[in-house]
Amino acid sequence: MASAAEQLAANLNFSSFAKAKELQKRLLFTFGALIIYRLGTYIPLPGIDTAVIADVFEQQSGGILGMFNMFAGGALGRMTIFALNIMPYITAAIIIQLGTAVLPSLAQLKKEGEAGRKKINQYTRYGTVFLAAVQAYGIAAGLEGYQSATGAAVLDPGMFFRMTTVVMLTGGTIFLMWLGEQITARGVGNGISLIIFSGIVAELPRALVNTLELGRTGVLSGGILVVLIVMALGVIAFIVFIERSQRRIVVQYPKRQVGRRMFGGESSHLPLKLNTAGVIPPIFASSILLLPITAISMNAGQGPGWLTDVAGFLGRGQPAYMLLYAAAIIFFTFFYTSVVFNPADTADNLKKNGGFVPGIRPGKNTAAYLDYVLTRLTFVGALYLTAVSLLPELLISQYAVPFYFGGTSLLIVVTVTMDTVGQIQSHLLAHQYEGLIKKSKLRGARR
């Protein structure tokens, strides 16, 4: 016999979506917010020559700048008010999360529930403003050194231009931070992830057209194009398979008698995903590495010689960059998994509800067992995230494809799509349950 939830899920169709007015409002709000974000990626900073910027980024589309531009939805290549995108906010969130594991004061705030969470969010916003201002000043200073055959990138360089750029870029990041929070609260899906997702999706058509053009002109052979297409499809299928994989730990509940009736005695399971951390580790790793490397790359031409050497040493496809990126992904996979799943708390909740894992004593033994299983799953998940993020990158650098179309972007697109679709299905299921409850109440009233 199918469960009630399975029967409801089987009945989900367009008619059920048409009746879910709340879901429709949330989707419209989400689409509207993302449209506003996309419009902002076309508003240029004051005082720059966009033609010069376009020439510079056209020459460096296959490097770190092209990779960051992909995450920014093309805003960096057009040098718009959203050029920094949401990356300073992500970096600040990483620093605060690491602080909760190191600093006792932040750790105490984390334990204080809703009030502590609000305080941590406030610190994250302060950190976002500081990081965005520092990075914006670095970009402004770097822009003043950009030259092309048509002239300089900055029309009137100086302190006024730098301060104006800092205000505009910092304000753009703050607005995106607020917009992401609004999408999460009033829309569908995680707002920050959807902003990054929409930026990548907006740049993919241009990347595909450029690839086909390279094939048409003979820069890339037909065989290489086929390899790239097959690789992309294979990576997508692999991501979907792994993201749906989970280890189910059997949980049993003892029988208990209430009056003359027996309750409990049933078996359930505790699902542990193979990749508990989701898409967060690659996003965190990209945020930590891309912003400083991009700043170094933008200032390398006008700085000391060692800065140029560092920019080349940390360039995309270089062993040092690959090693740092892989180490960051593995670290954030274990770190974020420990944030979202606490074996001790889970074991304590099972014990309070009378549940136990067969063959494992409740309490500390169950917590140790869950931690053991989770560590092994996280190790495999970290290898999976590293492979998906780096193996396509190695192939692309080998074939010299001049733009970023690697595994990280595919991972973000596929994972965010799956999470958002799952949330839509959850809203539809909740709407169907509400309909069933209303019908049962009406029948009871008639009787």
Model regions and ranges:
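N-terminal cationic and glycine-rich segments that engage phosphates or anionic surfaces
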Residues: 2-110, 115-447
